[in-house]
């Protein structure tokens, strides 16, 4: 599945389109590939002490997450991948959807600058395997490139 997903993601990137179009399609591919209930981007700028909801697939979501809080904010602050098998045991977890049980959050970093995070949620405990995490880290490069383009167009 990894190879096919990576090929799909690469093939839908169209540099002639606005970055938001590419980001939206990438999220749709992920949403319909995995057994997840939510996937989206949280945008980060130094102007705010929070991450702001960007494009996503799934239920209505939290619109602002404080930097350093919850899984998303902690990932942003620490600038490393967080894979949480049971979000209910994560100190300070912010429950945008109380049915979510596991979460994978990947920082989107360009030239040592945090641009945002890619957030995936699942209803299943310990859903995100090492294989899924590895694949999503590779896919995150596309999101980083498009988010950088968004901020510098």
Q: Where is each model-derived feature located?
A:
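Intrinsically disordered, low-complexity terminal regulatory regions
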Residues: 1-56, 138, 146-153
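Short loop/turn motifs at secondary-structure junctions and domain boundaries
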Residues: 33, 96-100
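Short hydrophobic/aromatic beta-strand element in the GNAT-like acyltransferase core
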Residues: 38, 105, 117
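Regulatory sensory and allosteric helical modules in signal-transduction proteins
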Residues: 44, 50-96
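A short, aliphatic-rich beta-strand micro-motif
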Residues: 102-109
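Sensory-domain boundary capping and coupling elements
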Residues: 109-122
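Regulatory loop-to-helix N-cap segments in sensory/regulatory domains
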Residues: 121-139, 146-153
């Amino acid at each position: 599945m990894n190879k096919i997903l990576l090929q799909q993601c690469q093939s839908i990137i169209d540099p002639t389109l606005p970055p938001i179009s590419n980001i939206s399609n990438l999220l749709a591919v992920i949403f319909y590939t995995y057994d997840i209930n939510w996937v989206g981007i949280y945008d980060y700028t130094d102007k705010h002490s929070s991450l702001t909801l960007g494009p996503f697939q799934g239920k209505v979501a939290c619109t602002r997450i404080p930097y350093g809080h919850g899984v998303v904010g902690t990932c942003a602050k620490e600038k490393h991948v967080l894979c949480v098998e049971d979000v209910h045991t994560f100190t300070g977890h912010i429950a945008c959807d109380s049915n979510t049980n596991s979460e994978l959050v990947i920082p989107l970093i360009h030239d040592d600058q945090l641009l945002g995070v890619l957030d995936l949620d699942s209803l299943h405990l310990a859903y995100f395997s090492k294989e899924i995490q590895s694949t999503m880290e590779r896919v995150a490069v596309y999101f980083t490139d498009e988010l950088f383009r968004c901020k510098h167009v």
